[in-house]
Amino acid sequence: MMFLSRPELIKKEIFEIAEYVPGKSIEEIAAAYGIDPPSIIKLGSNENPLGPSPKAVRALVETAPGANIYPSADARELREVLSKYTGFPVSNIVASGPGMDGLLDGLCRIIIEKGDEVIVPTPTFAYYELPARACGGKPVFVRRNPDFSLDPEKILGAVSPRTKIIFLCSPNNPSGNLLPEADLRKIVENTHALVFVDEAYVEFADRNLTGLVREYDNLAVGRTFSKVFGLAGLRLGYGILPEWLVKEYSRAATPFSVSLLALRAGVAALSDTDHLNKSINLAREGREYLKKNIPFAVYPSQANFVLVDVTPLKAKKVSENLMKKGIIVRPCDSFREAGDSLIRVTVGTPEQNEKVVRAFEISKTEV
């Protein structure tokens, strides 16, 4: 009898997946440079510097004793509150754990077959290609314009009979720019594929594209509680989908994927409009401060981060210099086709923003 080797148990597609590269953690930087952890400023993962809503924290404390009980299988309680927040009926909403990534996993699970294609404009959030590849799909990359805008004609030109999903990000990560409504309409109206718009950062922006889900049955929008709501550690996301897709998604969705703690914290966070508005205003004011004061070219942003071009310096060297000073930022060389001179900087508190500006000023002469 012949036995498979352990690697032979794994699907071939898995070996084609490049490992996802997250931002550096406080623990990593503290260990690498001998810095006291409380003094480190983490501006590399686009987290909310104000933390979660006090109401969400209170909900976690009150819910924890009941953590031995399963939550509702479909997160109905959260979806009802999201219905009021988004203006969409519950029948258009799905909740997902872990975060929006879980939504992407679920959609690829029900849509992508071996040999299917997904379109990914680059540079953008790296995760889109991972679940597609894991399901046997092939990512087709379309380069963005030099200003990181999309060319709808290029996107549509990449569509083939095997195209199943087109992934778009607005505001885009790592560039922070919005997708114009006219461009989205053109893409959606001229493809058979599902168009997925990632709006993880949309609360920080001047407008959103979610309303178009009412008009098109091949358009879906994903959102998260990790950014403006400050619940990144709970891994909670949701999708606004056409009703036909909600039905099929629910067939294969992981039961109880949203934990009881995440569910209750999400409901509480949605009720705290004061914390929501403070978080939005902090990001909007801070990104303008960073754009005006960082001594390198800074792209306009509609998110809670800015993209810095440190040319002629290299992003890795400048980022390492900042990290030695206890400031974590994100060099963008791990983003496909982003080059080696871009750094993404999360908007922090005013004090943190001042420190990062000073660190960039010093790095400009040190690197």
UniProtKB/Swiss-Prot annotation:
Class in the EC hierarchy, top level: transferase
GO MF assignments: histidinol-phosphate transaminase activity; pyridoxal phosphate binding
Keyword terms of this UniProt record: Amino-acid biosynthesis, Aminotransferase, Histidine biosynthesis, Pyridoxal phosphate, Transferase
Enzyme Commission code: 2.6.1.9
GO annotation (BP), single: L-histidine biosynthetic process
One Pfam family from the record: Aminotran_1_2
Matches recorded under SUPFAM superfamilies: PLP-dependent transferases
Residues where N6-(pyridoxal phosphate)lysine is found: K227
Needed co-factor(s): pyridoxal 5'-phosphate
Catalytic reaction equation(s): L-histidinol phosphate + 2-oxoglutarate = 3-(imidazol-4-yl)-2-oxopropyl phosphate + L-glutamate
Entry-linked NCBIfam families: hisC
Membership in a protein family: Belongs to the class-II pyridoxal-phosphate-dependent aminotransferase family. Histidinol-phosphate aminotransferase subfamily.
Protein known as: Histidinol-phosphate aminotransferase
Protein's organism: Methanosarcina acetivorans (strain ATCC 35395 / DSM 2834 / JCM 12185 / C2A)
